[in-house]
Curated annotation (Swiss-Prot):
The keyword Transit peptide does not apply. It is found in: Cell membrane. Keywords: Cell membrane, GTP-binding, Lipoprotein, Membrane, Nucleotide-binding, Prenylation. A lipid is attached at residue 145 (S-geranylgeranyl cysteine). This is Ras-related protein RabK2. GTP binds at residues 11-15, 63-66. GO terms for biological process: phagosome-lysosome fusion. Belongs to the small GTPase superfamily. Rab family. Pfam families: Ras. SMART domains: RAB, RAS, RHO. One of its GO terms (molecular function) is GTPase activity. GO terms for cellular component: late endosome; lysosome; phagocytic vesicle; plasma membrane.
């Protein structure tokens, strides 16, 4: 296996890549983020999930955990129900990892990133195991004199 593989993170901001499945083709880990205080942000998760190929492992990140939850915030129970529903429907091949993060307080940022990298590397290794490497070496000329 090539030890020098590249991992790329795309931050779509919900716009430039919208409905462009080409950017999500052959990904090793999907990362979906939403604001835990914004209903529309949470509701958009289904749309973003639909852009990925089936059986892509996912990490779900709820942002702005430094802000106190209100009655309008998305409850942890509701988030867990959403994850379970996606898992039960077979849309993902393994359990969705969920982190509540705060960029302001640096809460769970490193833990989430390490999980994303671990999942992506495992997925990459599995793809390498299941692939066939075909290489054809060019034939050397025979019986030709070069002056």
């Amino acid at each position: 296996m090539d030890n020098n593989n590249n991992k790329k993170l795309f931050n779509t901001h919900g716009s430039a890549f919208d409905d462009s499945k080409i950017y999500f083709r052959d990904v090793d880990c999907g990362v979906l983020c939403f604001n835990i205080h914004n209903e529309q942000s949470f509701n958009n998760l289904n749309h973003w999930m639909s852009l990925f190929n089936e059986n892509v492992p996912f990490v779900l990140i709820g942002t702005k955990s430094d802000i106190e939850r209100t009655e309008k915030s998305i409850s942890k129970e509701r988030i867990e129900q959403w994850c379970k529903q996606i898992e039960d429907q077979g849309i993902v091949k393994e359990k969705i990892h969920y982190f509540e993060t705060s960029a302001k307080l640096s809460t769970n940022i490193i833990e989430a990133y390490e999980t994303i990298v671990k999942i992506a590397l495992n997925q990459y290794k599995n793809k390498q195991k299941n692939s066939i490497n075909i290489s054809i070496e060019p034939e050397k000329p025979k019986g030709i004199c070069w002056w």
